[in-house]
Amino acid sequence: VRLRSAFTLIELLVVIAIIAVLIGLLLPAVQKVREAAARMQCSNNLKQLGLAAHNSHDTLGHFPSAGKNGCEAPVHPNIVANCADPNYGQWTAAYTVPTSNLPIRRQEWSWAYFVLPYIEQNNVFVTTNDTTVRRSVVKTFHCPSRRQAQLYNNNAKIDYAANAGQSLADSNTSGVIFRTGAGGPVRMTDITDGTSNTALFGEKRMKLDKFGQSYDDNESVFSPGWDSEVARAAVTDLDTNGTAGRPLSWGPNQDIRVTNPSIFTDPESGLSQFGSSHASGCQFVLCDGSVRGVRFNPDRVIFRRFCTKADGQVLNGDF
């Protein structure tokens, strides 16, 4: 019987090389499929948030508001001293003056808290312990391309923000969801530019000096409410004292992952912008419940109109 010879070294190397080439060809395709699935999940998350806002509108007669800063009255007595510190300011974690009615007690909390009953999270909504709520991770709040749904800095987070309009100034009411007390709650009839022409929620850009770190924001998704954690704008940013404006690039930007944040001349850039970890663009859910993508460098004027609910202008171009 003639024995079959084994692989020679050259034959083995050729087989290994062929396998390596096949892996090299297939890996990008697998990565594209994974990213497409992540982008679809992100789109579905936005659809759910849009539907939740609509259900909230049907129940209450208006969209949720964006809440207030932690140091806005009424202030919990435990943080009065901190709020007097100019370096503490609006970036404090919010507390609330205790009352017996949870929704009233948490009126300065973010829109994300008030949509909880409409995304099958009513058990979190009715939880009486504030700390437990602040640490309740909601998967719908997370884009799988951006970060995992888990606690960061011992707080629950969110990767989506409400459309606050042209800026995050306290007095601004040009968007759909803005600071509680700045104006009356927004109703469908207030969106005179058309619900199919106005952004409701969009993906958030990462704060650039936090690239390569475990989290990009320092507070819970639920409190304080009026904060860049849960609201973003089209045009201007706020300095840390909440008053001075900083011009932005007028549109969403891509989060290009880097490990050296020192290359950025302005680490605060991205603090109040929309943006995305997807390569194809930033996704928004509109006030009519539809989801659309916006490229990273849209026409500045058109994008500003897209974030304004009643300026009487037409979206007369592709962005």
Regions picked out by a protein language model, each given a short descriptive name:
Residues 3-42, 48:
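N-terminal single-pass transmembrane signal-anchor helix
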Residues 38-319:
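Surface-exposed loop/linker segments characteristic of extracytoplasmic
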Residues 1-2, 11, 175, 306:
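Polar low-complexity intrinsically disordered regions
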